[in-house]
Regions:
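N- or domain-start disorder-to-order transition segments that initiate the globular core
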Residues: 2-54
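M16/MPP (pitrilysin/insulinase) zinc-metallopeptidase core fold and M16-derived inactive scaffolds
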Residues: 51-133
């Protein structure tokens, strides 16, 4: 059975997306996927949802991090961000996730103008747990 992107878009439009405004919805033919762009009403954050029949679930959060000088501060912040939190008070949750997770991808990357934190897993529970650590 093939993925029906048009049907999926209609389902997603009807779903409860409280706190978000639907900006755009379209069929992504090349990817056999349904695509949505949402805007979080309170923060203005843009959320992109791509839905298809792939078992691998992917999440990424990214921030503009333009450099002010050549000290590498953005890269230092990238690493500091993954050094534990009140909710996850371990020295290096990233290492713990690498050891005990079913992830298919787990990383953080600093580019010249942005920093991204992507994760992926085929296991629903693991995926939600990883997202919780990253958020």
């Amino acid at each position: 059975m093939s993925f029906d992107a048009v049907k999926k878009i209609e389902e997603l439009k009807k779903s409860d997306i409280t706190g978000y405004e639907l900006v755009k919805a379209e069929v992504l033919k090349d990817m056999n996927s349904a695509g949505l762009i949402l805007r979080h009403k309170k923060s203005g954050a843009r959320v992109v949802v791509i839905s298809n029949d792939d078992n691998n679930k992917v999440f990424s959060i990214g921030f503009k991090t333009p450099p002010f000088d050549d000290t590498g501060m953005q890269h230092i912040i990238e690493h500091s961000t993954l050094c534990g939190s009140r909710k996850y008070p371990v020295k290096d949750p990233f290492v713990e996730l690498c050891k005990g997770s079913l992830n298919t991808f787990l990383n953080a990357m600093t580019y010249p103008d942005k920093t991204v934190y992507p994760v992926a897993s085929c296991n629903d529970t693991d995926f939600k747990n990883i997202m919780d650590v990253y958020m």
